[in-house]
Amino acid sequence: MVKKFREEQLKLAKKVVVKDEFDKIKLVGGVDQAFVGNEVISAVIVCDYKTMKVIEKQYTVVKANVPYIPSYLSYREAPAIIEAVNKLEKKPDVLLVDGHGIAHPRKIGLASHVGLSLDIPTIGIAKALLCGEIKEDRIVIEESTRGYTLVTKEHANPLFVSPGHRVGLKSSLEIVKNCIRLPHKIPEPIHLAHKYADKIRKELENKNPRLKPNIFNHKKEFGCIE
């Protein structure tokens, strides 16, 4: 399974576009996941880019058909994200994804995978470095800049921002900066998606008390091992 995924990722990575392919941004989306039992809850929020007012929200619950495998998170979470985004009536001009973009060993983290699958501009935002090293504020992998660190709050650890698909390096950083609303550390669309996914998770648990949160989930990856 891993060998197959690796070969597919290497092929897909060649299709990733790291340049701006979008017009003026009016709507920005954020997506985050929660887990209950063996199901993935994917929540997507669409906000007005200037005001961060919520325009639309959707969610989906999909069975996780692939186990958690470090650096292959896309095969576990992307199907739920794609289904949730496809339910939207108002499509975002750019989608912010809780995970890595090209700052990934094979240049195709969750944000890149989702961007390719949906053919939309995406940006990855993670809370820990997956691979490479930091030089000043740049994420450098194999002597190539793959993204940037971003400190959004005083005394807070940085976020790791990288293009997913159809967004350039500098634009990725600027878009994420524009989506920060203190006191929240992470971009507002992802913050809201996180809250929404958690709300759905609790509702599902209340309907079926035997369901339990899956503690070995993507938050480990979001921490460092996508």
Predicted regions and their residues:
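C-terminal binding/interaction regions
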Residues: 1-19, 57, 78, 83, ...
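Signal-transducing coiled-coil linker helices
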Residues: 21-25
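Two-metal-ion RNase H-like nuclease active-site motif
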Residues: 26-36
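A glycine-rich, hydrophobic loop/mini-helix early in the fold
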Residues: 36-91
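Flexible, glycine/proline-enriched loop segments at strand-loop-helix junctions
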Residues: 68-71, 98-105, 157-163
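Catalytic-site beta-strand/loop segments enriched in glycine and acidic/polar residues
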Residues: 82-114, 118-120
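Acidic, glycine-rich active-site loops and adjacent beta-strand->loop/helix elements
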Residues: 99-102, 126-131
